[in-house]
Amino acid sequence: MPASSGQQASAIEAKGFPNLPRVHWTERYFRLVWGAVGIVGCLLLWQLGSSTGVFDPLFVSSPLEVLRTAVLLLPSPEFLGHLFITSQCLFLGLSIALVVGVLVGLPIGWFPRLNATFEPVIAAVYGVPYIAFLPVIIMWTGIGMTSRVIIVFWSALFPLIINSIQGARGVDDNFLRVGRSFSATNFQMFLTITLPSSVPYILAGLRTSIGRAIVGVVVAEFFMSSKGLGYFINLKANALEMAPAFVAIVLLALFGIALVSLVTYIENRFCNW
């Protein structure tokens, strides 16, 4: 006698899906320690190059000089204003890119006709350097906060779209067959199977997008702003005041490390399936 739906559900629940091995806390600690070793090693090499004259002090400040300058610069209201403008622009553009990238990419990956229609368009646009769109964006929106957010958004968008497409296309067929066996609609399977299965792909795309977004905000502030860390770096570098410029560069690097570490933590904490 064939098993009822309730019995099938109980059997599946009792058996469970195979679990992927979790990342043990010792492995995370190992990665953290060696990551710190890598950063410290780079700083030591930087200081050694500055001390031995390999790096011209006119163009490359030493880490110690950058640290001394940072202690004086960070409490400055003017510098904090630049930092706030860049942070605001970066997080706005990146957040909008995340939402739009997922909302566009998942349906394209889920529906074969949409995939066949839009995949060549995405590949063509993605192949164009996003800096090439800078004059067009300036013509459309002028020079201001809106144009800078659009540059950050455009810089970060396509890795999220592409990874969302791959996530939707890479769903295990066994999961879909289980959903169909319980008469789940396409929309229900999309919400309960495709979307959760795509989260690791989306987070991988977000890690790539973070670096592109930071580059985008700096380039936008180079050409389209009188505020922000990008403007500050350009201003100080043109005046050959390299220590303050390197303070801003290090802060941007710390932004990237912090955001990527946050995404990695979320992935390790919630995506171990």
Give residue spans per PLM region.
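Transmembrane alpha-helices
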Residues: 150, 154, 186-220, 246-247, ...
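Transmembrane alpha-helical segments of polytopic membrane transport and secretion proteins
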Residues: 1-40, 261-273
